[in-house]
Amino acid sequence: MVDVHSQAIRSKNMRAIRNQDTAIEQRIALILKDRGFSYRVQDKALPGRPDFVLPQERAIIFVHGCFWHRHHCYLFKMPATRTEFWNGKINSNVERDRRYIGQLQQSGWKVLIVWECALRGKLRLEDEALIERLEEWLLAAMHSGEIDHQGLHHYRVE
């Protein structure tokens, strides 16, 4: 399938996609604030520059886009053009995620990934369900987890 945009226009569009303070990150920030959790954002001192750091809970939350981090859900679809480029790009993102999560866990942090599909789209979690899953993870002995449109799951660094 041929892209409807020229390579220059497509490149411009992709550069315009924000990588911090996105709408889905703002939703998590509002939930954390409403529940009284203190947190820092985009902490450069930690591997992976986590989206949210909750120091009192020794917990980290990453908010991942399903496309950019290859979540196998209904929101992910590999582009039909420049497939080799996108496959390499997304593979490197996934490998980097695993490396950072492993480093954080070795340093004693609990790590949670909240996937975009949990926050937006036709199957997103309702606010109350999302809040319950976040609190469940924070209170559980689960050292790494992920929340997607289906709920809370264990996450394993391979």
Which residues make up each language-model segment?
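Nucleic-acid endo/exonuclease domains
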Residues: M1-I113, R120-E158
